[in-house]
Amino acid sequence: RFFMLSIGTPALLYRAEPSGMTEVFRDDHPLAFYDSMHFLNDQFGIAVGDPIDSRMQVLVTHNGGKTWAKRTWSQTPKLAEGEAVFAASNSAIAYIDKKLWVVTGGSASRIFSSEDQAHSWREVALPLAQGAPTKGAFSVAFYDSKHGIVMGGNYEQPADRNGTGAITDDGGKTWQPLTADNSFGYVSCVKYVPNSKGYALVACSPNGLYYSTDRGYHWQRLSAEVYHALLFIDEQTLIASGDEKISIFRVVSR
């Protein structure tokens, strides 16, 4: 089965199976706009959306997507005016070992974490570009409960190398920013290569497709092709999507 989540209002969530497609959630609020959806296992899934009354919208399922419910106002992260989740690549959510992370951008760029299936949250400021609607964290990935990376920048100035990434080795409590010399500009999506011990990553941007073999501190270009989103099927198979194209790459370790 798979799920489809529309953007705009009304926000519609469909569950598709061989037997057919079913609408499982509908949000008619005039400000409803959902940005990212992720399943943490075959039962628990989460979707997050732009703030309403200063609160991030958080939608969850506990039965494999058959039914969905919003977290209450007090259970959702409070966002600053102009702060939101970006919908660039459906990678603003990460989940490892029962811990959940969501990144934001805009007027402020932060990472929110939860260890109780999105009932309560902690927040940490990120050292990424921020202060404008086009700036912030666009993508987050964790290899394990300690090692993670956030990437983004300014999508209107994709060549700007300042404030485009940061790395953590303590589960997101602290973040070390990438220097401009070690960046390649705005990033829409970053993923760890499975079974790489957290050393190998792939990232995509308007500047091309890049890879790292040292946890994300240094990058080399794989291709000048422009992609917006990435997904590893396994450690040897990477799917990349862009404007009117989907490519499959075979990852060869050396």
Which role does the model predict for each range below?
Residues P10-H29, L59-L79, F112-Q130, Y155, ...:
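Asp-box/BNR beta-propeller loop motif
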Residues I7-T9, P51-R55, G105-S107, Q157-N162:
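Short, solvent-exposed loop/turn segments at conserved positions within beta-propeller repeat blades
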Residues A32-H38, T134-S139, Y186-K191, V226-E235:
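Repeated scaffold domains used in trafficking and secretory/extracellular systems
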Residues S54, G64-F112, R122:
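Solenoidal tandem-repeat scaffolds enriched in leucines and small polar residues
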Residues L231-R254:
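Blade-level signature of beta-propeller repeat domains, shared across WD40, Kelch, NHL, RCC1
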Residues R1-F3, Q43-A47, K99-W101, K146-V150, ...:
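Entry beta-strands of beta-propeller and related beta-repeat scaffolds
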Residues G153, T179-Y210:
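Loop/turn-rich, solvent-exposed surfaces of beta-rich toroidal or solenoidal domains
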Residues H29-Y34, P77-A87, Q130-K135, S183-V187:
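Short glycine-/Asp-/Thr-/Trp-enriched loop segments that recur within the blades
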